[in-house]
């Protein structure tokens, strides 16, 4: 079964723009560099040629990965989701039960994630551990170091 990738319309558009940029700006530059390197002669020992071919392959892999996300995209209308539990699009304030630290996360879809600003993928193990919880409940999240417990303090929507 193909797993859908939840995202907002903005996240979808951001990924489409990134694909467009890669295909229409980066790829032509790499193709040009390959052509220039090919003109230098013997391809067997042409390091520049091989490096650019490798760059081309890596860029194509990135493009294909983003195309796959777009193909499996499920655009979510955040305004239709429940407001009393942790769901896609909400900002949740949690307390680490073990240490008492408060943290805030926004659960987002592909294309919107930004871990430095607390925007985490709803499909990540951490995001999945929080989904469905209500204020006052405790979420257990599996991480490589073991299980972490977080108490849900506040759920907000920035619509």
From Swiss-Prot:
InterPro entries in UniProt: GreA/GreB_C_sf (IPR036953), TF_GreA/GreB_CS (IPR018151), Tscrpt_elong_fac_GreA (IPR006359), Tscrpt_elong_fac_GreA/B (IPR028624), Tscrpt_elong_fac_GreA/B_C (IPR001437), Tscrpt_elong_fac_GreA/B_fam (IPR023459), Tscrpt_elong_fac_GreA/B_N (IPR022691), Tscrpt_elong_fac_GreA/B_N_sf (IPR036805)
Pfam families registered for this protein in UniProt = GreA_GreB (PF01272), GreA_GreB_N (PF03449)
Q: Which residues form a coiled coil?
A: 53-73
Q: Which domain of life is it from?
A: Bacteria
Q: Does the record's keyword annotation contain Transcription regulation?
A: yes
One Gene Ontology MF term: DNA binding
Gene Ontology biological process terms, A to Z: DNA-templated transcription elongation; regulation of DNA-templated transcription elongation
Q: Which UniProt keywords apply?
A: Coiled coil, DNA-binding, Transcription, Transcription regulation
Does the record's keyword annotation contain Transcription regulation? yes
Family assignment from sequence similarity: Belongs to the GreA/GreB family.
Against HAMAP family, the record matches this protein to:
GreA_GreB (MF_00105)
Tell me, in a sentence or two, what this protein's role is. Necessary for efficient RNA polymerase transcription elongation past template-encoded arresting sites. The arresting sites in DNA have the property of trapping a certain fraction of elongating RNA polymerases that pass through, resulting in locked ternary complexes. Cleavage of the nascent transcript by cleavage factors such as GreA or GreB allows the resumption of elongation from the new 3'terminus. GreA releases sequences of 2 to 3 nucleotides.
What is the protein name given in its UniProt record? Transcription elongation factor GreA
Q: Which organism does this record belong to?
A: Rhodopirellula baltica (strain DSM 10527 / NCIMB 13988 / SH1)
Question: Which taxonomic lineage is given here?
Answer: Bacteria, Pseudomonadati, Planctomycetota, Planctomycetia, Pirellulales
User: Gene name?
Assistant: greA
């Amino acid at each position: 079964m193909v797993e859908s990738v939840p995202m907002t319309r903005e996240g979808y558009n951001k990924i489409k723009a990134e694909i467009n940029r890669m295909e229409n700006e980066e790829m032509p530059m790499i193709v040009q560099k390959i052509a220039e390197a090919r003109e230098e002669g013997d391809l067997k020992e042409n390091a520049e040629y091989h490096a650019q071919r490798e760059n081309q392959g890596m860029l194509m892999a990135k493009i294909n990965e983003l195309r796959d996300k777009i193909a499996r995209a499920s655009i979510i209308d955040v305004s239709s989701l429940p407001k009393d539990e942790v769901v896609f699009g909400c900002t949740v304030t949690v307390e680490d039960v073990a240490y008492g630290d408060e943290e805030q996360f926004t659960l987002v879809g592909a294309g919107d994630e930004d871990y430095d600003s607390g925007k985490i993928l709803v499909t990540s193990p951490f995001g999945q551990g929080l989904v469905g919880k209500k204020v006052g409940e405790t979420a257990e999240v599996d991480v490589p170091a073991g299980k972490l417990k977080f108490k849900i303090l506040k759920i907000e929507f920035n619509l």
